[in-house]
Regions:
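Feature responds to low-complexity, polar/acidic, surface-exposed segments characteristic
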Residues: 4, 8-28, 33-57, 64-82, ...
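Predominantly extracellular/luminal carbohydrate-interaction, adhesion, and secreted-enzyme modules
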Residues: 118, 146
Length: 154
């Protein structure tokens, strides 16, 4: 599905590497492609990326859309479950969820709490079990594509 939708072409011509931890650059590139790969118009606010980086346009798009901010991008940062749903939620326009995230490990005042509640309402995720969401756990490439499929692929 993700290849057919031009969200990713994999890690090589014959592999996707679903069990590899996804980086910030990768998830934002996936989201940029999932949103049609629009040409960014803003100047580069980041000191740690250049036009030669494969994720350059995705990073600028993410900054324009308010998904990320600051002067450093941190492309190789491991992507967590909280980051994943927050990026997806912001890309969707930050819609207000009807309820709250009902997980023992998601405080109501967490920056990502609304994003988690939205992701549950949209059936993107149901948590990791035992009443937890595991916001600090890293996401694999396979998990992120699964989240995207649940959000957009049906």
């Amino acid at each position: 599905w993700a290849v057919e939708q031009n969200i990713t072409s994999g890690t090589s011509k014959t592999t996707f590497s679903p069990n590899v931890t996804c980086t910030k650059a990768q998830i934002l590139t996936f989201l940029w492609h999932a949103n049609g790969s629009p040409e960014p118009t803003a100047a580069n606010p980041f000191t740690d990326i250049t036009p030669a980086d494969y994720f350059y346009k995705a990073a600028l798009w993410a900054a324009e859309k308010g998904l990320v901010s600051g002067s450093t991008f941190g492309a190789n940062t491991d992507c967590t479950r909280a980051m994943t749903v927050e990026y997806m939620w912001k890309a969707a326009g930050s819609p207000a969820p009807a309820g709250k995230a009902d997980f023992d490990d998601v405080p109501a005042n967490a920056d990502y709490a609304q994003a988690v509640a939205w992701a549950v309402e949209k059936n993107i995720t149901s948590g990791t079990g035992d009443g937890n969401f595991s916001p600090a756990a890293t996401c694999t490439r396979g998990q992120i594509v699964t989240f995207l499929y649940r959000a957009m692929g049906k």
